[in-house]
Curated annotation (Swiss-Prot):
Protein name: ATP synthase gamma chain
Topology of this chain in the membrane: Peripheral membrane protein
InterPro entries for the chain: ATP_synth_F1_ATPase_gsu, ATP_synth_F1_gsu, ATP_synth_F1_gsu_CS
Protein species of origin: Streptococcus agalactiae serotype V (strain ATCC BAA-611 / 2603 V/R)
Gene: atpG
NCBIfam families: ATPsyn_F1gamma, PRK05621.2-1
Length: 293
């Protein structure tokens, strides 16, 4: 019985240590989430402005008839996917949702590896796809908690350049969209070619009319459209990172709560075992006393 009590006590102490670790990780993820949410809000100021400029320009008659490849659809022979996962685990179902969505998409729409190209951001996704012999063209590992454009700009530019060079004919970003601290949604968002933009982004009094573009429209579009697309992709990365921190916080909170429940159950088990041991000792003492009479 003493050995059993000792084992239960050791389990309680071990679980308490685990609970302290998961609680600390929860607080760290919570702090990261607050920073990421603020970064997302700050970026939206820039994203909204460039989206408005691009929308106004494309809805004007200044660019009608442009043959810019970023605006023109072509027969789809190959599709590019930017897939955003985490670099580490302990984030609940964050990665599994993305990887399942990608596998379903590839199974449904592609029969050969040459039909698609994956640009992987995050070690979990890179390892997953490579282990299955899938077509990973580029990868980025070790993404910062609050990624700067300098860190991700190169791989984003590579993706846009691959489309412009017709290495694939359309480009999607697959990521977890942050809804709130408890919820995220998988998004498969088309980036290229640029589709019809939201009419609400351009009001009647803002649509460009009666202006000339200098030096010419093609030069303007050549500069603006990649910048616009890259900003959308960067925004998706920030959004995904925010969802990752939220998932990490929720996972660690769940782990902490589960540890507390285990501790409570073990404590009850320990007290019952201790009570049984005491009762057994009293019974033995009484029996011994009776034997001496």
């Amino acid at each position: 019985m003493a050995g059993s009590l000792s084992e239960i006590k050791d389990k309680i102490l071990s679980t308490e240590k685990t609970s302290k670790i998961t609680s600390a990780m929860q607080m760290v993820s919570s702090a990261k989430l607050v920073k990421s949410e603020q970064a997302a809000r700050d970026f939206q100021v820039y994203a909204s402005k460039i989206r408005q400029i691009t929308t106004n320009l494309l809805k004007s008659d200044l660019v009608s008839g442009s043959d810019n490849p970023m605006l023109s659809s072509r027969p789809v022979k190959k599709t590019g996917y930017i897939v955003i996962t985490s670099d580490k685990g302990l984030v609940g179902g964050y990665n599994s949702k993305i990887l399942k969505a990608m596998m379903d998409t590839i199974t449904d729409y592609h029969t050969e590896n040459d039909d698609y190209a994956i640009i992987s951001i995050g070690s979990v996704g890179s390892d997953f796809f490579k282990a299955r012999g899938m077509n990973v063209s580029f990868e980025l590992r070790g993404l910062e908690d609050q990624p700067s454009f300098d860190q991700v700009g190169k791989i984003i530019a590579q993706a846009v350049e691959m489309y412009k060079n017709e290495l694939f004919d359309e480009l999607y970003v697959c990521y977890n969209h942050h809804v709130n601290s408890l919820t995220s949604q998988v998004r498969m968002q088309q980036m290229l070619p640029i589709k019809e933009l939201d009419a609400e982004e351009a009001s009647e009094d803002r649509v460009i009319t009666g202006f000339e573009l200098e030096p010419n429209r093609e030069v303007i579009l050549e500069q603006l459209l990649p910048q616009y697309t890259e900003s959308l992709i960067y925004g998706a990365i920030i959004d995904a990172k925010t969802a990752e921190h939220a998932a990490g916080m929720t996972a660690m909170q769940t782990a902490t709560d589960n540890a507390k429940n285990v501790i409570n159950d073990l404590t009850i088990q320990y007290n019952r075992a201790r009570q049984a041991a005491i009762t057994q000792e009293i019974t033995e003492i009484v029996a011994g006393a009776n034997a001496l009479e």
